[in-house]
Design a protein with these regions (language model features):
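Alpha-helical junction/boundary sensor with strong preference for TPR arrays
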Residues: 32-34, 54
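Alpha-helical linker/edge segments of TPR/alpha-solenoid repeat scaffolds
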Residues: 45-64
Length: 64
């Protein structure tokens, strides 16, 4: 599969809220030999965004 095809699969996983699978696919795209620099940057930014979303904690909900 080409980097572009893998990127589309990663985007589909992200849209379906399958963040773990999306991160794995984004990493595969970033490591692909045929990936452009722009595509690699998009993948890295997407991974960082997903990790930021997953690490969000609303501290107001933790107060008794």
């Amino acid at each position: 599969m080409t980097a572009s095809e893998l990127f589309e699969i990663a985007q589909e996983h992200r849209r379906n809220k399958r963040f773990g699978d999306a991160i794995n696919m984004y990493r595969a795209v970033a490591e692909a030999e045929d990936a452009t620099e722009q595509l690699k940057k998009q993948c890295i930014a997407s991974i960082e965004l997903i990790q930021e979303i997953n690490s969000f904690v609303n501290v107001d909900l933790l107060n008794p």
